[in-house]
Regions:
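C-terminal auxiliary extensions adjacent to catalytic cores
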Residues: 1-156
């Protein structure tokens, strides 16, 4: 389910970049001169694919242990580690979607959204400023992912 949520988030993010719905392509005013949010979408696509591979069941490959007394081992510890990685990747995927959403709202101003969306937008803007020109934005993704990990969006 976590891997699928990441896939859905990536597809929603992609829709924001297409240049439809009255938003500029790549969520930048000068997409010919700037890459906008092209690279973070590559990142989410890679993380989504990684999550799909991590969801292959570890129990599909069992090996006898304990001098043959344990003929089928669940590989539960491996599954737990893989799931932890999927969740970390999902946090980054969702962070990119939130970053794209905040940028998209910039092009809708002065219109306002619901108080919940505005609160989320304001929280994001405490960590990440609007993208005007190309810059390194990996730290922006990590800052929003940290907000997710800290459950800051739950109080909105």
């Amino acid at each position: 389910a976590a891997a699928e949520l990441g896939n859905i988030s990536d597809r929603r993010s992609y829709l924001l970049l297409e240049g439809k719905f009255g938003l500029p392509r790549l969520l930048t005013e000068s997409s010919g001169l700037n890459s906008g949010f092209m690279i973070p979408q590559y990142t989410t696509a890679a993380l989504v694919t990684e999550n799909k591979t991590l969801c292959f069941p570890a129990s599909a490959d069992s090996i006898p242990t304990s001098l043959g007394q344990e003929d089928h081992v669940s590989m539960g510890s491996i599954s737990g580690r893989k799931f932890n990685q999927v969740l970390g990747n999902l946090e980054n995927i969702l962070a990119v979607e939130l970053m794209f959403g905040a940028q998209g709202l910039e092009f809708r101003r002065p219109a306002k959204c619901s108080k919940y969306v505005e609160n989320a937008y304001n929280l994001i803007r405490t960590k990440v400023e609007k993208l005007e020109d190309d810059r390194l934005i990996g730290e922006d993704m990590l800052a929003i992912a940290e907000l997710i990990r800290e459950r800051k969006f739950e109080v909105i």
